[in-house]
């Protein structure tokens, strides 16, 4: 049997970031991953899966030592954010209002993962098992024993489940999850644009769902189209040429000239684990919670989990293995994750109907929010993870 301090299941963005931060504390780390991503080539088309990486997440990536590698690939800073339903009733945010150089960056998920995996190579105390998966786990008071499908038997003081929304580790640990399926699906559409993109991301609410635009490097962008499952299935079946015409009909004219290059779709599901731990198995990121992607906060919440767990272990010093740490972790992270989930659900519910008085009220609210001064700044700082 092999032994380590920390076993991390999943080498995605959350798992790889956790590995880097804990290895930097001198802990021995094993990372178990079924499949590594394709390596980066600047000639590759941009991936569909992107994230709006907040300033707090940038700071975490810098702390992990991965930001230097990301800067050698491709990313797109955004400095302004705008959201509206009716013309003239908009809320606008600007990095300059907070004295920041940008609100964050739009980055392909795979590139964030690759930068973190590259950083992992710098640590002699990180060992990766790939391709490998956990077949079983058995807990005792002081450790967890894992049986992997590469015939490795591994014991660890902590097992961190970072293996995503359908976490197999969570199931093996016997942790239940509450689940809610929204009445919408989401389509991601990568476009080539007529002109190089500016530093703004925007979102318009419509009766059938939001329409959003995220800038990507150069003359590229990402569109996000929320609609009924049947409508999204119909859009997914269209040729790129037909979809281009459909987007022109249903997105704001400010989008300008563009051509659809790639598309994909998925259902919208909110999940929240009933517990963030079972014994010495701890959930981080999507294994613990997923939210409506309206504000692009998914991975940022995951990185806040990572920062919290790393801080708890660091603060504990030689007591990093004590079982009471999991209670502190859940006490810190569950309320914040629940608040963000509830906030996204509030937006979803408020903007998903055509009741006249409510429509007027929500547009007035957007307009008032734009003029709210300190409250607006506080909300933005919270969304960016700066408070």
Which residue ranges define each predicted feature?
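Conserved N-terminal helical subregion
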Residues: 2, 59-62, 73-172, 180-185
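N-terminal Rossmann-like FAD-binding beta1-loop-alpha1 element of flavoenzymes
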Residues: 5-31
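Conserved Rossmann-like nucleotide-cofactor binding loop
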Residues: 14, 37, 166
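Glycine-rich FAD pyrophosphate-binding loop
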Residues: 23-46
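N-terminal glycine-rich dinucleotide-binding loop that anchors FAD/FMN and/or NAD(P) in oxidoreductases
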Residues: 47-71
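Conserved FAD-binding catalytic core of PHBH/FMO-like flavoproteins
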Residues: 61, 159-263
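FAD/FMN-dependent oxidoreductases across multiple families
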Residues: 231-321
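C-terminal helical "tail/cap" subdomain of flavin- and related membrane-associated enzymes
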Residues: 311-387
């Amino acid at each position: 049997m092999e032994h380590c301090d920390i076993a991390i299941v999943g080498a995605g963005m959350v798992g790889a970031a956790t590995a880097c931060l804990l290895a930097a504390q001198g802990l021995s780390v094993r990372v178990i991953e079924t499949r590594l991503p394709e390596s980066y080539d600047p000639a590759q088309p941009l991936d569909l899966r992107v994230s709006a990486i907040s300033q707090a997440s940038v700071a975490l990536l810098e702390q992990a030592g991965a930001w230097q590698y990301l800067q050698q690939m491709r990313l797109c800073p955004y400095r302004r954010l705008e959201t509206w339903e009716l013309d003239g009733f908009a809320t606008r945010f600007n990095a300059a209002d907070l004295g920041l150089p940008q609100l964050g960056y739009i980055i392909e998920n795979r590139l964030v993962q690759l930068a973190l995996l590259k950083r992992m190579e710098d640590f002699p105390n990180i060992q990766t098992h790939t391709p490998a998966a956990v077949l079983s786990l058995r807990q005792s008071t002081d450790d967890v024993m894992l049986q992997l499908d590469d015939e490795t038997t591994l014991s660890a003081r902590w097992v961190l489940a970072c293996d995503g929304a359908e976490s197999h580790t969570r199931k093996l640990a016997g942790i239940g999850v509450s689940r809610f399926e929204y009445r919408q699906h989401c389509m991601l559409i990568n476009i080539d644009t007529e002109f190089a993109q500016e530093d703004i991301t925007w979102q318009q609410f419509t009766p059938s769902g939001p329409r959003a635009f995220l800038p990507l490097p150069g003359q590229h962008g990402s569109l996000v189209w929320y609609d009924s499952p049947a409508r999204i299935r119909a859009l997914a079946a269209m040729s790129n040429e037909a979809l281009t015409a459909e987007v022109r009909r249903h997105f704001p004219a400010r989008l300008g000239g563009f051509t659809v290059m790639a598309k994909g779709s998925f259902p919208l599901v909110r999940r929240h684990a009933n517990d963030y731990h079972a014994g010495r198995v701890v959930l981080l990121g999507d294994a613990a919670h997923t939210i409506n992607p309206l504000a692009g906060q998914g991975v940022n919440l995951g990185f806040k989990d990572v920062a919290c767990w790393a801080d708890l272990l660091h603060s504990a010093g030689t007591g990093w293995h004590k079982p009471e740490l999991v209670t502190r972790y859940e006490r810190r992270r569950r309320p914040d994750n629940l608040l963000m989930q509830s906030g996204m659900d509030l937006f979803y519910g408020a903007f998903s109907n055509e009741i006249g008085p409510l429509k007027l009220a929500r547009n007035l609210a957007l307009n008032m929010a734009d003029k709210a001064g300190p409250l607006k700044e506080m909300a933005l700082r919270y969304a960016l993870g700066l408070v």
